[in-house]
Curated annotation (Swiss-Prot):
Tissues with expression: Expressed at low levels in leaves, stems, flowers and siliques.
Phenotype caused by lack of the gene: No visible phenotype under normal growth conditions.
Residue numbers spanned by region Disordered: 308-361
Record-given protein name: DUF724 domain-containing protein 10
Organismal lineage: Eukaryota, Viridiplantae, Streptophyta, Embryophyta, Tracheophyta
Function: May be involved in the polar growth of plant cells via transportation of RNAs.
């Protein structure tokens, strides 16, 4: 049960602002802002109509009463009654109505991604456009608001399982074009649900450059149609016959092969250009190197690199060709009306997390590191024996060091390993009253190490959680200051009231004395009146004197 706040009674008088919710609009969790008005040309004075404040849509109240819920406008201070974190149920101010949803991502202290279930959508909101979920209870003689403070337990339970594609995750969506070409398009996951014991996802792909997600219809796909955003790799120069992906015409990432590489000048900047052979169309086009990235295949929860034919033997080439041919088939979305072959999908899903973790310790990164430098320093054995690297195994590739002098690479790599260890200790030593800049600095340092292949996800998640808690603590401190201010004001009023009470007591004591004096005077007067009464009666009843009747 949430917190209860007294509510004003619902008034159905003309001009009153209310909130209404349609039962037949497909979503009963939307509360529209409306106003009650007199119905035009009505012969009944009590007949009113509801007008939505933005759309000027008017419907007679007596026709809507069985279709709509009506409640008063909630108090304006309910926004201060909510602590927002991942999973918190909220109402969001959107399109002149309050829509029910839950938070899937905390951007910072004042910006949040909110997920809506019907229709599926994710929208960013500022804190001042969010409020807690509200329930209005009306008992005729008394009414109140119930302020909810619950979290989406189902979403949090699923999030604890570390799903690869939870709502709010930016991914790449497999899209099939003409001639069977497979293109990977940036997309956003809006909803995850289970159907026939298989997870499915509602996503919206990113359209042509310059347009937003909202302009595209949503799609329902399975796990094999999605992959995470590949980690960035800095490439100084692409080799001939190297397989790459290019973001072309806003369509998405298309596969190609380098057939020519050269430098050129654009304006005042020197640019590297590559001529590519697009595999699907067999057309040769020229692209800036900044528009390219190495081709990697997402398979069994790990990224696999597709090597060029010049860097491997004939046996490897056959293996790569086999991989290339099976890759589109492996990643194409299924026909939603077809049955598909799902015999191995459940096993693949259950083993995906395990294989991804095993890949962190695989030998592929070690081989690439050995190409950059040879581990000659004895400090490597010390590093490998450190508890921190046993708890959080690391296998950095150090690829950016390829641009550094070879004799300096190993020392820089050792320095990064030590830096990673020290940063973890700094995270554990963070205090609740430290400056926000300390948290941001640590996060940026981990981000730099991630460019060299370090797995800092756990540390980054902890920093984000600590930042969220710190933001909540900061808001609570502000609330505490406000509460202390109110307490001080109330104490001041109490002291003033006590002073007034003492003054009234003094006045009452003086008044009591005056009353006593007045009562004493009153007693004397009463005594005098009694004496006069007796004298009057004695006088009136006295016998007449005999002399009064003597004749002269």
């Amino acid at each position: 049960m949430g917190r209860q706040v007294p509510s004003e009674s619902l008034s159905l008088s003309e001009g009153c602002e209310v909130e209404i919710s349609y039962k037949n609009n497909g979503n009963e969790s939307v509360w529209y802002k409306a106003i009650l008005e007199a119905k035009p040309n009505s012969i009944f004075k009590e007949e009113l109509s509801v007008r939505l404040l933005k759309d000027d849509f008017s419907t007679p109240l007596n026709e809507l009463r069985h279709k709509v819920l009506i409640r008063p406008i909630p108090p304006t201070n309910v926004q201060a009654c909510i602590d927002i974190e991942i999973g918190t149920f909220v109402d969001a101010d959107y399109k002149d109505a309050w829509w029910a949803g839950f938070v899937v991502k905390v951007i910072d202290d004042d910006k949040f991604w909110v997920c809506f279930d019907s229709p599926p959508d994710i929208i960013q909101f500022d804190r001042n456009h969010l409020r807690p979920t509200l329930e209005w209870v009306d008992e005729k003689i008394y009414s109140w608001w119930i302020i909810g403070s619950t979290r989406n337990s189902e979403f949090l339970k699923r999030l604890a399982e570390e799903p690869m594609f939870s709502p709010g995750t930016i991914v790449e969506l497999c899209s099939k074009r003409d001639e069977g070409e497979v293109v990977w398009v940036p997309a956003l996951v809006y909803k995850e649900f289970k159907e026939n014991d298989e997870y499915r996802y509602i996503v919206k792909d990113k359209p042509l450059i310059g347009r937003s997600y909202k302009s595209r219809p949503s799609k329902t796909v399975d796990l094999r149609s999605l992959r995470p955003i590949p980690p960035p790799i800095r490439v100084k120069e692409y080799r001939l016959d190297e397989y790459i992906e290019v973001y072309h015409d806003g369509i998405g990432w298309r596969q190609g092969r380098v057939v020519k590489s050269e430098g050129g000048v654009m304006g005042s900047l020197f640019q590297n250009w590559c001529t590519l052979l697009l595999e699907a169309t067999k057309k040769q086009l020229m692209f800036k190197q900044s528009d390219l990235r190495p081709l990697r295949v997402w398979e069994d929860g790990v990224w696999k690199t597709r090597e060029s034919s010049l860097t491997q033997g004939s046996g490897d080439k056959t293996e790569v060709e086999t991989q290339r041919k099976t890759f589109p088939k492996k990643t194409l979305p299924r026909n939603q009306n077809g049955s598909g072959n799902d015999s191995t999908l459940e096993n693949e899903n259950s083993n995906r997390k395990r294989k991804r973790e095993e890949n962190l310790c695989s030998g592929s990164s070690v081989e690439e590191t050995n190409i950059l430098f040879e581990k000659k320093l004895p400090v490597w054995k010390i590093l490998e024996s450190m508890e921190v690297f046993k708890t959080i195994p690391q296998s950095p590739h150090f690829r950016p060091l390829a641009e550094i002098r070879e004799d300096s690479r190993e020392m820089l790599a050792v320095g990064m390993m030590l830096t990673f260890s020290c940063l973890l200790e700094q995270v554990k030593a963070l205090q609740h009253d430290e400056a926000r800049s300390s948290f941001i600095s640590l996060s940026n340092s981990f981000a730099e190490l991630e460019k060299h292949g370090f797995n800092a996800q756990v540390a980054q998640l902890r920093i984000n959680k600590l930042l969220t808690l710190r933001g909540m603590q900061s808001r609570k401190m502000d609330e505490l200051k406000g509460a202390k201010k109110v307490t001080a004001e109330k104490e001041s009023v109490k002291v003033e009231n006590e002073r007034k009470i003492l003054e009234l007591q003094r006045l009452n004591e003086e008044m009591a004395k005056e009353i006593a004096q007045s009562m004493s005077c009153e007693g004397k007067i009463l005594q005098q009146l009694d004496n006069m009464k007796l004298e009057f009666q004695a006088t009136a009843s006295a016998p007449w004197p005999k002399w009064a009747f003597r004749s002269t």
